[in-house]
């Protein structure tokens, strides 16, 4: 459990320091949308960002050329994952918001990297899940074993209203 000082640091220092970089990349992906299984520039730019922040990245991942897995606090007894989508739709680009949704997961991972010493025995991974609109990227990753051994996984998805839901 994070203590109040760490929570305050996240809200007052880390998020403001990291969000500009994350949202600039989201805007870049929105301006240069890539369809499923062709997210080569988007995935490369996300991976480069993660590496700049000292995060270990496996790329490509599980046989998918635009999938990746970034590992924060490796070796933890518990494993959690943030899933990041980044594919676009034909003609309307990022109308579904994957550029922003994916970057919200990446931003959560960047914050986790900054407070990794407080994570105790929890490994946090960011898993890039390509081709979500048409090809079922998460299904392909699951079949390749990408999600085995996780205790928890979550993702963000854009919505037209302010809401928070847990889907089980």
Question: What role is predicted for each listed range?
Answer:
Residues 66-69, 87-95, 99-100, 119-168:
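Histidine/acidic-residue-rich, glycine-tolerant segments that coordinate divalent metal ions
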Residues 2-125:
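Acidic/His- and Gly-rich active-site-bordering loop/insert found
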């Amino acid at each position: 459990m994070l203590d109040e000082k760490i929570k305050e640091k996240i809200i007052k220092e880390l998020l403001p320091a990291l969000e500009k970089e994350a949202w600039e990349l989201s805007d870049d992906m929105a301006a240069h949308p890539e369809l499923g299984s062709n997210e080569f520039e988007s995935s490369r730019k996300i991976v480069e960002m993660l590496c700049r922040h000292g995060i270990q990245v496996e790329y490509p991942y599980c046989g998918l050329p635009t999938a990746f897995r970034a590992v924060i606090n490796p070796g933890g007894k518990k494993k959690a994952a943030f899933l990041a989508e980044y594919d676009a739709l034909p003609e309307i680009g990022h109308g579904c918001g994957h550029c922003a949704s994916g970057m919200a997961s990446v931003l959560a991972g960047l914050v986790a990297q900054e407070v990794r010493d407080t994570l105790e025995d929890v490994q946090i991974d960011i898993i890039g899940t390509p081709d979500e609109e048409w090809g079922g990227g998460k299904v392909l990753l699951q079949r390749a074993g990408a999600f085995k051994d996780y205790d928890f996984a979550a993702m963000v998805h854009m919505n037209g209203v302010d809401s928070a839901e847990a889907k089980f």
